[in-house]
Amino acid sequence: CNMFGSGNTPKSPTGSCPGWLMTAVASWGENAEDAYDQGLVEMGLGDSRLIEVQGAFLPMGFEATPPMPLPMGSLVECHLATSYAYNGGTACAGVAWAACRTPEGEECAIVAKITTELDYEETEALLKRNLQRRLASRDLEVVSFDVAVDEVTAAQDHFGVAMAALILPESLKMSGGGNVGSCLLYTSDAADDQA
């Protein structure tokens, strides 16, 4: 399942930072790590390197976009909610974003996430409430928002995972650090030459 934007996406003069909401479930994991990996593959993040981000604010210029394929090995920022279940148990995970306006008229965007052992509807309601609290505590006016929630029931004697993510594939490029997808390697010969 995937979801993106409500069509009323935030605009910012600082440039664009594309992102999208995705969900996935896996109910047949041999263990929690196996279920987690299956969920990442299902969500399209199985071949990416992830930086899981905490905090409420999204990069300036956030814009909801349709999902895009990610190159193998790419470094991707994401706000990830992961909830586990075992042996017939149920788990839910959700992520939401909101485009906002400050009292001074500046545009920004925030994110909220949640994990529960409740059903889909209850989890979605709690997620929306968490998003409202984040808006209220910062005195922000909502312009538009979107949510993504998924629910899993683990198979008998197996682990299950419900995952929801806001994926921001280009946010790390915006930091001025250039290409963060490569690394510099020194061979032992190069290290000897520098010594």
Task: Please tell me what each predicted stretch does.
Residues C1-L185:
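Helix-coil modules at protein/domain termini and other flexible surface or pore-lining loops
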Residues Y186-A191:
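Conserved small/polar residues in nucleotide/adenosyl-binding loops
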